[in-house]
Amino acid sequence: MFRKTDTNEQLDIFSSPSTYMKGRAAKKYEDPHAWHNEFYQYVTSKIDEETFRPLFKEGNMGAPNASIRILVAMSILKEGFGCSDEDLFEKCEFDLLARKALGMGTLEDAAPSIDTYYLFRRRICDYEKEKCVNLMEKCFGQVTGEQVKVFKISGRSVRMDSKQIGSNIAWYSRYEIVHATLRKEMNEFTLPSLNPSLRKKVEEALTEDAQKTVYRTDSDTMAVRFQELGQLIYSILVRLKWDETHLLHRVFHEQYNVEHGKAIAKDKKDIKASSVQNPNDPDAGYRSKNGKKNKGYNTNLTETTDEEDKPSLIVGVQVESATAADNSFVEDAIKKAEEVTGNKVTTLYSDGAYQSPSNRKFAETEQIKFVANGIQGKRSRFDLTDLLSKHQVLDRNTGELIDAVLTKGGKWKVKLSEGKTRLRYFAQEVIDRFLTRMQIEATPLEERNKRNNVEASIFQYCFHTRNNKTRYRGLLKTKLFSYCRCMWMNMRRIQLFEITMCQRA
């Protein structure tokens, strides 16, 4: 049965740690601007436990057996310190500052058990799988919304940036991906369902060390082995009649085609970036950005721009597979920011990756000033400023003005005096892109650089990652990490802001 935490507990002065502390220690422990007191004031005490009511069935006595507020705050504290679960529970038991931050102000308060903590996080993930609603995201929005109200942050101007972040998985070759999936799916429950001859082949395949096979085998032999492994898996799928709900079925059809009952390996170029990169994390995608390869996820952060005498807070967090383009986040990010702040966004600062025709149309429809510090693609050789008015194009290389003619297909055509390709065509899309670039370049540099501040948020977001990898596997766990990490970042910003304001005073 759902049960709220009692917020009106009677405090025993003899159980408070500060009673046994001397001057300096007691002063620091009770300092309202110390991180532990700021955390309790602006995070722990702001958590609305009603958000998590759906996780607990009515009539189920004994559940939850710990404060939901403390369980959520523990997750935030963990990502704030970047510590392991073991270190987290050690802090909850013996670190007086961490206990104070969680609301355990007396020595008699007991920390939740590790089983309760894990069960709570698993329930959040299971609920999202079933209902497609992330309760930790709702909690993030609710807590941040409370902070926005306290500091009267308008949120009318926001900036956003994204970060490719890796999943905690090994990098596998195609052969290793298929072999590891076979090993994962074939167990004591599925093997008995195979006929004796097929079972023997599978058992032989499972004894192989795929990593050593790839390392020791030449490419031609490897291609043959990859083909044979695919044929074996095809026989398993036919025998067990497995459909797309099974991971082995998905991996097989991502890596092979079937022609006349035979498994034919797909060409490397035909493998999609959204295909399984490692069976231990089927949600992770592949992307190469600015020469850096990533197998994992793409996180987008939206934050308020600096307002005078007000902190800048993260008001939106989105996590998708690494294949998600930056410009796909914009509309949803704006809507979430408006829900948190309660105000309409009027100005958006971003980089060129967020530019797209649909986003520009969205900004125009919603009357949002879209300020980007660039646009993807190199600068055109041709200046199209006078194309529509004077029907002329300026060749920047030669300085020549060239007359343009409108074709029946709706494109503008110009004829060059030299070069292999004398005719050039300009569609409306190209013209719109040119005008957008000109508009961006005309924006004052100071205005465009407002977006750069969000890069500090990106740095802090992945501060505790190793080799740009989180500790987690799976989209749902990566989401939990992201929401908790950003709630911690907001708390630290508030703390630094209040310290700065006190120093000014």
Model-derived features with residue positions:
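Charged, often Cys/His-bearing segments associated with DNA-binding zinc-finger transcription factors
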Residues: 1-45, 417, 431-432, 500-501, ...
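Generic, well-ordered alpha-helical segments
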Residues: 44, 65-69, 80, 93, ...
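Short linear capping/connector segments at secondary-structure termini
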Residues: 57-58, 103-105
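Short, solvent-exposed segments of well-ordered alpha helices
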Residues: 61-65, 79, 288, 478
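General structural concept
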Residues: 70, 96-101
